[in-house]
Amino acid sequence: MSAEEDLIDYSDEELNTNETAAPAADSNGKKGELAAGGNVDKKGSYVGIHSTGFRDFLLKPELLRAIGDCGFEHPSEVQQTCIPQAMLGGDIICQAKSGLGKTAVFVLTTLQQVEPVAGECSVLVMCHTRELAFQIRNEYNRFSKYMPDIKTGVFFGGTPIQKDAELLKNKETHPHIIVGTPGRLNALVRDKFLRLSSVRIFVLDECDKMLDQIDMRRDVQEIFRATPQQKQVMMFSATLSDEIKPICKKFMQNPTEHYVDEDTKLTLHGLQQYFVALEEKEKNRKLNELLDDLQFNQVIIFVKSTLRATELDKLLRECNFPSIAVHSGVSQEERIRRYKEFKEFNKRICVATDVFGRGIDIERINLAINYDMPADADSYLHRVGRAGRFGTKGLAVSFVTNDQDKEVLTAIEKRFEVPIPEFPKDGIDASTYMAS
């Protein structure tokens, strides 16, 4: 069986309802309805893929697999900016708001570069609180789940130092990556429990919090002196004052500086996302407006059942929107044929159920429309992830018709910590979601 067949050779759990797509309001061809004259083949144009996706960073397969498990498909702005530079081994200063993915920058790039040697620490990460240290260690564990040879340890005050010493004495348990607070790490170095002569990468997270305080800065300096002169140094923070920047640079050699706009918003996979509040009977009118007004390379429209997929696909084609439907209600052979037709860009509109919402890589999809809201946040993640894969820009629009839809929308915003606003009445500038 081919890889394509593997991707779509299973039945989606669909609602066996008798619901069909909402009928067109009338057939007089007015703007806003699924009517003749809306030839989408004249809309938009194919856009090359030039922006960065995680796979384009040439990360180890084990890292890409872990990233996929986490549901991440597109790097945030700070990740697109910093990861390539970090992988080149250069020193980095990065300022970006909390929640924009700074931690993943140094976690992924250090895991990419680490070469584990028993009894040696090659990556040292420092932060100002034990809570943050524990959180960073957990991120390392999450992204190194397919790298069993990599050991990560966390060290902070408030615990018996002898336990840390025992861990570090044993080559079998000695971490290759150490995360900790300056006070405890300096004590371990001072008492010769921790040797840092093999450190290749030195990271300060929330560096301003450590370098602002005289005592903590002194600990950082002592630890820094215990590491080799030739190493990579990376510093990250949500806030960097003009007074702190020169202090940071004293630890570095010709660092590249990355300052992500304060107004940058974290969005799910870097996609723009909106919802449209409307009644069930208004869905076709709004869908027609979107297909007419929005520029796109390819669009995927998600519905909740095979019957609705079939009916909506039929309605679209009757109204001169050439589309195909992919769902479990057609034979495996036919499903593969349709999938290939869409993948090869012979059709630009696809109506699908959740069978097409998982693991399908089609570079040109940059618009996803939830004609029917998904059942939960996980399904939403898989659906809208179809738009803007491979690091391209993308847009996702969800139709919200009832209280259940609103509950799902709220759950999505809470789960992914992403506000999803209402679709603007005056539309969206195509340059914000079409790759240039």
From Swiss-Prot:
Domain comment from the record reads as follows: The Q motif is unique to and characteristic of the DEAD box family of RNA helicases and controls ATP binding and hydrolysis.
Q: Where is this motif: Q motif?
A: 52-80
Q: What is its main location?
A: nucleus
Tell me what organism the protein belongs to. Pyricularia oryzae (strain 70-15 / ATCC MYA-4617 / FGSC 8958) (Rice blast fungus)
Binding residues annotated for ATP, in chain numbering:
A96, K97, S98, G99, L100, G101, K102, T103
Report which superkingdom the organism of origin falls in.
Eukaryota
Q: What class of enzyme is it?
A: hydrolase
The UniProt record lists the Helicase C-terminal domain at: 270-431
Gene designation per UniProt: SUB2
The record's Gene Ontology biological-process terms are: mRNA 3'-end processing; mRNA export from nucleus; mRNA splicing, via spliceosome; subtelomeric heterochromatin formation; transcription elongation by RNA polymerase II; transcription-coupled nucleotide-excision repair
Disordered: region residues: 1-33
**Known catalytic reactions:** ATP + H2O = ADP + phosphate + H(+)
Read off the SUPFAM superfamilies from this record.
P-loop containing nucleoside triphosphate hydrolases
The EC code for this enzyme is 3.6.4.13
Q: Which cysteines are joined by disulfide bonds?
A: none
Q: Where can this protein be found?
A: Nucleus
Q: Which GO terms describe its molecular function?
A: ATP binding; ATP hydrolysis activity; RNA binding; RNA helicase activity
- Residues forming the motif DEAD box are 205-208
Q: Which family, according to the similarity comment? A: Belongs to the DEAD box helicase family. DECD subfamily.
Quote the protein name from its UniProt record: ATP-dependent RNA helicase SUB2
InterPro entries to which the protein is assigned, alphabetical:
DEAD/DEAH_box_helicase_dom, Helicase_ATP-bd, Helicase_C-like, P-loop_NTPase, RNA_helicase_DEAD_Q_motif
Q: Which Pfam family, just one, is annotated for this protein?
A: Helicase_C
- Function, please? ATP-binding RNA helicase involved in transcription elongation and required for the export of mRNA out of the nucleus. SUB2 also plays a role in pre-mRNA splicing and spliceosome assembly. May be involved in rDNA and telomeric silencing, and maintenance of genome integrity.
Q: Boundaries of each Helicase ATP-binding domain copy?
A: 83-258
Q: Which UniProt keywords apply?
A: ATP-binding, Helicase, Hydrolase, mRNA processing, mRNA splicing, mRNA transport, Nucleotide-binding, Nucleus, RNA-binding, Spliceosome, Transport
> Gene3D superfamilies of this UniProt entry?
P-loop containing nucleotide triphosphate hydrolases (3.40.50.300)
Q: Which GO terms describe its cellular component?
A: chromosome, telomeric region; spliceosomal complex; transcription export complex
